[in-house]
């Protein structure tokens, strides 16, 4: 890591006089946010090093690496440029500034912070430049030791790209350790996985280039997945991290990784697939894929049709209890067994499928759909606190009239005063209602976004079938 001070002030000499000491009060150092003075670049050759015209990556937030306030103190005109090799994933940091001074907040020690992010990957410039001339054997070894995942929809348009499944040990574990800085920078809330723990695997998206000296592999992205025990005798597959390198994002590699994982889960009869704290975009892609799979899954059609019919014909304003858009329990189990979609994800996709099946111009059914989303979110956010100590209506279906049959009962008060719900004032309830409606609008907007993507992808699928 290179640190350079642009200008060095002459040292001040002290006088030996006994005059009264003068005290000067300077402005408190406001500091500078790391996001404003630090940039990270991904480079493929030595000529790009020290150039700011190369591929810049956009970390989700650099500030959180620098203390609670995310600021760096004690530097004037600070610039931190970090270059990461796309071949070996080593890094080189160039730090420059005009001068340092303690403005009341001390002088931030940059070296341990950068070491905390980049670890042993961070090397001096000469060594960093030398890494470009060497073949990264651990990438080649990891790919060679793995097995290619072949399934319907895998990279038919570009046979040079493939997904390789490897156990997280040996060369693959070493490769992952090199990728950790990019994971920390680009995957919000991520932490390095424990590669010593049993059950970890990686799926690598690689592009193979055949040369005279042999095959050369370029890493485009990866997923880290964990196989863990599910009682009594099955395995669950949890996706811990998915990362596509910045230049290759938007090319469908993340989608390809998810499809490969689904293929593994079905072919090996995994219990189900889960994702650890997915980002909004990853959840968007995942839901789009799962909705497409569900649309082609015949067992859901009767239940889906029944829900859609209820939304079209039911008048929720006259019901004692709101209609719930919940699929039958046996259908949820069938979906888990056949498609390996877990219950929470299926419920999310179910609402999207219902939305897709409704006519957006039918105001009654769309209003009923929104009412169902509202009731679900109200229950999730407010829980039982929203309905304590009050008269309730419980729908009791009978052979006479399903719409009009109900029972009335009072909820019991909690004896412990500390556990009782504080009665809310009308203005508080109004604010709560407004906030809840805003959240419902956001939820429906997200549902509509996935539905639009699914519709577009369905058209593409139909076009492919016609061409074939």
Swiss-Prot record:
<feature type="site" description="Interaction with histone H4 N-terminus">
    <location>
        <position position="200"/>
    </location>
</feature>
<keyword id="KW-0808">Transferase</keyword>
<feature type="binding site">
    <location>
        <begin position="249"/>
        <end position="255"/>
    </location>
    <ligand>
        <name>acetyl-CoA</name>
    </ligand>
</feature>
<feature type="binding site">
    <location>
        <begin position="242"/>
        <end position="244"/>
    </location>
    <ligand>
        <name>acetyl-CoA</name>
    </ligand>
</feature>
<keyword id="KW-0963">Cytoplasm</keyword>
<protein>
    <recommendedName>
        <fullName>Histone acetyltransferase type B catalytic subunit</fullName>
        <ecNumber>2.3.1.48</ecNumber>
    </recommendedName>
</protein>
<dbReference type="GO" id="GO:0005737">
    <property type="term" value="C:cytoplasm"/>
</dbReference>
<keyword id="KW-0539">Nucleus</keyword>
<comment type="function">
    <text>Acetylates newly synthesized histones during DNA replication. Highly specific in vitro for the non-acetylated H4 which is acetylated sequentially at 'Lys-12' and 'Lys-5' into a di-acetylated form.</text>
</comment>
<dbReference type="GO" id="GO:0031509">
    <property type="term" value="P:subtelomeric heterochromatin formation"/>
</dbReference>
<dbReference type="InterPro" id="IPR016181">
    <property type="entry name" value="Acyl_CoA_acyltransferase"/>
</dbReference>
<keyword id="KW-0012">Acyltransferase</keyword>
<dbReference type="InterPro" id="IPR017380">
    <property type="entry name" value="Hist_AcTrfase_B-typ_cat-su"/>
</dbReference>
<dbReference type="GO" id="GO:0000781">
    <property type="term" value="C:chromosome, telomeric region"/>
</dbReference>
<comment type="similarity">
    <text>Belongs to the HAT1 family.</text>
</comment>
<dbReference type="GO" id="GO:0005634">
    <property type="term" value="C:nucleus"/>
</dbReference>
<dbReference type="GO" id="GO:0010485">
    <property type="term" value="F:histone H4 acetyltransferase activity"/>
</dbReference>
<dbReference type="Pfam" id="PF10394">
    <property type="entry name" value="Hat1_N"/>
</dbReference>
<dbReference type="InterPro" id="IPR037113">
    <property type="entry name" value="Hat1_N_sf"/>
</dbReference>
<dbReference type="InterPro" id="IPR019467">
    <property type="entry name" value="Hat1_N"/>
</dbReference>
<feature type="active site" description="Proton donor/acceptor">
    <location>
        <position position="276"/>
    </location>
</feature>
<comment type="subunit">
    <text>Heteromer of HAT1/p50 and p45 subunits.</text>
</comment>
